[in-house]
């Protein structure tokens, strides 16, 4: 079962790869519209993190951002666990991608803009609460 799971998540499934080839060959406006939509989502999410005072590299070509949460004083694991339990928002600890990921979280913007905005509000509330705890 583990091997099956590993092969399923290692790369895009063959059917998805063939679908991508077909989309490229028969390119139409929907691809450009989708690219613009994801660009807008990325910009909204990045601005949200910057407004919270979280440094965030401006990634291109992915569906994820990797903001720094070092200013909260929490480890990546603690931040993610508390955010999940306290605000019901799931993000991935940076340590899932190696030691250098400590102090960061990975956030997907492959959601609707409304869901992204809701999540950003909850993350902002959590970050403010954690910073206030540090100052008490």
Show which residues each predicted segment covers.
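PLP-dependent class I/II
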Residues: 1-136
